[in-house]
Amino acid sequence: MVWQSLLDIDKQLLLALNGDGGAGWDTFFYIVSARLTWVPLYAAILYAVWKQWGWRRLLWVAVVLGLCVGAADQICNFFKHFTPKFRPTHTPDIEAFVHTVRGYRGGLYGTVSAHAAISFAIALFTARLFRKRWYTVAIFGWALLLAYSRIYLGVHYPRDILLGTALGLGLGAGAFALFGRLMKRVETPPERTENISSDK
């Protein structure tokens, strides 16, 4: 009974947040949700890493963050295949009431939102990396916007977004911890460099 009540609340929240905002908002959130839209942002982040720390750290950031994003995507796919749950656009009792944009309905299942997981993983990792308040606010604002776009388009329930967000934050934190350990191993501390030079 409790579980069914939670599912009903999830559906009610979805329908409340999925209202038709008109052609302008439809286009806006459709573009926001498209993965290719944010390629320039990812390129800008990598450029900022290179500008501040150089090629070596850029390579490690790209590798660790790439593994983090890949893990988020695969874990979400695992849940979609092994604990399948219909997307709102494919749920028989509410699909007729779900607002969709340009006929986009997504695949059948959407247990955990990969968009939310990936965006929040990137947000946490890069916020910890740059440690700038303005950047932290901006990148988490971007992640929230991207996550909400999935509800607006009707392809994820709020619960899917929350699960994806939790997964992304966990993976982002783990990836940054791994990155920190790697940097301690591969980068020689300045003090050690000075000692080596003075010994010659």
Model-identified regions with their sequence ranges:
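Membrane-embedded catalytic cores of phosphoryl/pyrophosphoryl-handling enzymes
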Residues: 99-200
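Interfacial segments of alpha-helical transmembrane regions
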Residues: 46-75, 136
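Membrane-helix interface segments
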Residues: 24-25, 54-60, 89, 131-137
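Hydrophobic, aromatic-rich transmembrane alpha-helices
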Residues: 41-52, 119-127
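Membrane helix-loop-helix hairpins that form the core translocation module of multi-pass transporters
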Residues: 58, 66, 70-86, 162, ...
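N-terminal transmembrane-helix/juxtamembrane module of multi-pass inner/ER membrane proteins
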Residues: 1-41, 76-107, 200
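Alpha-helical membrane-inserting segments
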Residues: 45, 71-75, 79, 171-179
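Hydrophobic core of alpha-helical transmembrane segments in multi-pass integral membrane proteins
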Residues: 40-49, 66-67, 170-174
